[in-house]
Amino acid sequence: MSFEQKPKVTVILANLGTPDEATVPAVRRFLKQFLSDPRVIEIPKFIWWIILNLFVLPFRPKRVAHAYASVWSTDSPMREIVFEQTQRVQAYLERENKQFDLTVLPAMTYGNPGIDAVLEKLATNPQEHVILLPLFPQYSATSTAPLYDAFAKWIPTQRNLPGLTIIKDYYQHPMFIQALAESVLAYQEQHGKPEKLLMSFHGIPQPYADKGDPYADRCRITAKLVAEALHLKDDEWAISFQSRFGKQEWVKPYTDQLLQDWAKQGVKSVQVLSPAFSADCLETLEELAIQNAELFQQAGGGSYAYIPALNSDQAHIDLLAGLVQANLDALTHTLAHR
């Protein structure tokens, strides 16, 4: 299929974000932007402003900056990985779609390159179509929805709007499940099989789930499908949720408590996979890989290992590009018949 002039299509791969540097000022700026989003913290604005500015931002950035410094190389691990994913998805899609003038851009909800800045670039270079792929396998109002909000804010400011596709999530896509299962098998081929495989997901407050956020249920489906793909028995794996913040109840079971319980029950070897993350970041590299290893071993456990996120594995690139390609195929058909 060919067109008189190649239609311009932009694909945006968007992740949560990261500070610009592993320094206290940079981390404070990032946390302020992130924790000021009412999608993330559902507390009355005035009350949360007091808590954030008087009790969180004066103290938390120092500890978080120290944690970032422990995993930082030339840049944030997440940003480096998202940039590599973007380049490889671009190469894949360019090979398969000569009919489009195609660009793939990275974006972050918080920090740089910010989604708002990416959308402003599109305003000066009108597109036929924009495809947004949030790099969150399981939709949540706390992670994916802020990207919808960014588009909702941008759309009223534009005159010549593009067509828009948002890929909501892919928590049970067969290619996603297979890629996760293969990553576990590849790791275990080198390091052996543990007594327990723990699939740990970032948590959300229980009240958010009670109000209709489908995230926790989608995490459970992902975990169950991965366990089935690996032919695991019920006592060989578990699901848990990490990174709770504040005093309210979050979705359970909690990763740290489950690991301590396993250690006390005599479990000697654990491997941890986090299918909520498309790119390794502070939470996986520092909290899951280091903090939780110490927690498990101090409670009497033995071997503990974190299995890396899919990152830029070829199976992951094939998945991400395939999700976009399905929409490009539909767009090709639509443009050819209008």
Curated annotation (Swiss-Prot):
Keyword Iron in record: yes
Quick check: keyword Metal-binding in the entry? yes
Which NCBIfam families does the protein's record reference?
Answer: hemH (TIGR00109)
Query: What does the UniProt function comment say about this protein?
Result: Catalyzes the ferrous insertion into protoporphyrin IX.
InterPro entries given for it?
A: Ferrochelatase, Ferrochelatase_AS, Ferrochelatase_C, Ferrochelatase_N
The organism's taxonomic lineage, starting at the top: Bacteria, Pseudomonadati, Pseudomonadota, Gammaproteobacteria, Moraxellales
Which positions make up the signal peptide?
none
Q: Which domain of life is it from?
A: Bacteria
Q: Which UniProt keywords apply?
A: Cytoplasm, Heme biosynthesis, Iron, Lyase, Metal-binding, Porphyrin biosynthesis
Q: What is this protein called?
A: Ferrochelatase
Q: Which GO terms describe its biological process?
A: heme biosynthetic process
Q: Name one GO cellular component term.
A: cytoplasm
- Top enzyme class, one word, equals lyase
Entry's family note: Belongs to the ferrochelatase family.
- Origin organism is Acinetobacter baumannii (strain AYE)
Q: In which pathway does it act?
A: Porphyrin-containing compound metabolism; protoheme biosynthesis; protoheme from protoporphyrin-IX: step 1/1
Q: Which GO terms describe its molecular function?
A: ferrochelatase activity; metal ion binding
Q: Which reaction does it catalyse?
A: heme b + 2 H(+) = protoporphyrin IX + Fe(2+)
Q: What subcellular compartments does it reside in?
A: Cytoplasm
The record's HAMAP family line, in alphabetical order, gives: Ferrochelatase
